[in-house]
Amino acid sequence: MRPIIKSNKLDTVCYDIRGPVHKEARRLEDEGHRILKLNIGNPAPFGFEAPEEIVRDVILNLPSAQGYCESKGLFSARKAIVQHYQSQGIFGVDIEDIYIGNGASELIVMAMQGLLNPDDEMLIPSPDYPLWTAAANLAGGKAVHYRCDEEADGFPDIEDIKSKISPRTRGIVLINPNNPTGAVYSEELIQQVIELCRQHDLILFSDEIYDKILYDEAQHVPAARLSDDILTVTFNGLSKAYRAAGFRV
């Protein structure tokens, strides 16, 4: 049997925290070492459980949830999401603007597949949640990384972002609160990124999955509240704030 070779599309796709890093951790465990895995945001192994009302509602609704739902997700869930963001001062969002997926990661991949043509560029923070880089490259685009300055509390370097915008740039990814640094961005910083999107007609992709996990009186500012005049795509979910990483719809 001839060797089965993986697609060339995967040459620029790397997901170290679930690949090489995880394999090395398994190797060390096999040698008898105790490894504390912090490679992914999975709260369950550390004893954090989903709220009782979520568990109860899942059990109660299982008998009536055995078929396909609408392609965008359950109407009632999308309505609840609209109401949630209205409570945060984000208006003008319709139920038809809401898409529910099997976690934010699936929706990130779908967004990159739907947007990027060959050699289109996506500005992504460094360091980043590696799925963003992998998804952009897998879609045929090119992940271009901008610097998050360690000496400036991990905030994005606006001048570095400016220098990397090209005619091929389609959007800017903002991860706030940031994964992996934990930095929570100021309203002023978010406004600066929005202004770049405005000037260059770019889409803002705002990954806010950790928006409720805040420390030291930090306050999260949702990007969509500040960006009425540009297309802002917000990614969020139940996995982190509600400890429901294993719950899929």
Q: Where are the language model's segments positioned?
A:
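Short acidic capping loops at alpha-helix termini that bridge into adjacent secondary structure
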Residues: 92-98, 118-121, 168, 229-232
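Conserved PLP-anchoring active-site segment centered on the Schiff-base-forming lysine
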Residues: 97, 114-136
